[in-house]
Each structure stands twice: as C-alpha cells, then as structure tokens.
Amino acid sequence: MNHLARILFFIALPAYGLLPSLAKSQTAKDLITPRMTQEASAPGKRVRQVAPEYEGTRVYHTLYLPTDWQKGKTYPVLVEYTGNKFPACGSTGEVKGANLGYGLSGGKGFIWISMPYVQKGKKENAVTWWGDRQATIDYCKVNLPRICKEFGGDLDNLFICGFSRGAIACSYIGLADDEIAAFWKGMIAHDHFDGQKKWGYPESDRASALKRLARLKGRPTLVCGNANDYLKDHPKLGTFTFLPVPVGKIFDIPDGPVIHTHTDLWAHRDSPTRQTARAWLQKQIRFK
C-alpha cells in the first residue's frame, strides 16, 4: 500500500465504524495477575514470603502491595484462599495461582494476601482441601496481624475472599472460631459456600456450617456465582448480597486463560458484574 492509499484507508475507517472497535481492542485489556517472585516486597510486586515458624519448609504465603502503596499509610486488605487443584478449570490449588483478589482490586488500593492451607506434617502447602485444618487456621491468626503491622494493613478493613474451595474456606477456615472470625469486615465467596453440600471432610454438614456462620453476626457477604443458594433461607446470619456471574457471557470460552466457566478469573475482564462487585467492596470501606 503506497503512502496516499494508506492515508485514504485510515480516512475511510470511521465511515465503516472500524476505528471505535480498534480503539476498544487496544484499551479494554484484561488484567494479568502478577507472577510471584522471590524479590523484596514493593508496590506492584507479588512476592513469596515464609513465616518465621515455617523457615526451612515449603509452606509460604504471597503478599501483593498495591501500585499506590506508600510506607506509613494504611490500606484495606483482601485475604484470599484458592480453589482445589482442578486442571479442568485451570485451578492449580497453589497459593501462587490465586487470582480473585487481584481482579477485585485491580492491583491498587488494597493489600492482597494469598494464605496457604498447611499440609499435614507442616512441611508444604496443601493443593487439595484443608491439609492440617488447625494449622491452616493458626497460620492466618498469626500472620495476618503480623503482615498488617509491617505493611500498613487496616485491621478494620480486612476482607476474606475465595473461589471454590476458597469460597468454602471463607467460613470453614475464616469462621472456624471466634478469634479468627473477629478479623473480618466482610467476605466475598465465588462458586460454592460452606454448608451448601456435604463433602468428605469432618463437619461439612449444614448444621455444622450454620454454627460457623453464626459467627458472621450479620456482617456483609458478597455471594457470587453458583452453589450457594441455601443462604437465601438464612438471611439473619449475614447481610448477603447475591451476585450471579455470567462467565459464559463475559468470556467466549475457551478464551485465553479462561478455559471453563468455573474460574477465579472472571473479574479480570471489565463487565457490569465486576463493576458491581467492586462497588460493593468500596461501599463496605466507606461505611467503616
């Protein structure tokens, strides 16, 4: 194409409605979760950290400081638990594979921590179910205040969140006793919820789950996706907001890393659903 033809081509584009779509494809980019590194913590970095109690083991958590992080300031915190290892949907079950918190925050304004499930024997993280449940609970109890103290996490604005296994963990781990339950300003659970069905681990029945949920004491909970509708029968336990997530409409699956409708990547693409979730989160912080 010679120079004159190239000019005429681009002059003609608006008449055919092509320039707006071209601009959209360039600006409406999906989020990409930062890769975990071994670096020192810094704004915009997601780093691997080992608690002093677990030095010499493969147990770790990840810490992400938002791009607008400044020393001496405080930030709300998203504490995430991952789904089980389930290759069919792309879930690795690993701490470093977490995505939901990054999608909800967009990488700014929130400290984001991905907590481990400590495997039995306390030598590594568990990628399926709970490992040593009490050790998992204790890890959060010890390390969440420690991280907040060092990096400016706002103890009055801690939100637990999770996908699949992690959605169940919001209650099964996060409301396991009064001490850990007292941390949370609210929770965000996507696809599944503690008590929706009975699984193969202890106290997964609904009666046990309802005892845990009593510790929620009416606090705000964003209930996203599927396998959680029994909560509609228990409105007094929490301030529940139900948010359907039409993954199949947000993505043309398979669509890049999204290979299944059961995914923690739904908030990585702009959509009315993501906008609703983020607005819900900001509202909870405003009404501190």
Predicted regions mapped to residue ranges:
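Short glycine-enriched nucleophile-adjacent loop
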Residues: 167-179
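The feature captures the conserved acid-bearing segment of alpha/beta-hydrolase catalytic domains
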Residues: 179-273
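A domain-start/cap signature at the N-terminus of enzymes
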Residues: 19-76, 110, 201, 245-248, ...
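Bacterial N-terminal signal peptides
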Residues: 8-17
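Catalytic active-site module of serine/aspartate enzymes centered on a nucleophile-bearing elbow/loop
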Residues: 269-288
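Gly/Ser-rich "nucleophile elbow"/oxyanion-hole loop immediately N-terminal to the catalytic nucleophile
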Residues: 69-73, 125-164, 178
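Active-site machinery of serine-nucleophile hydrolases
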Residues: 77, 81-142
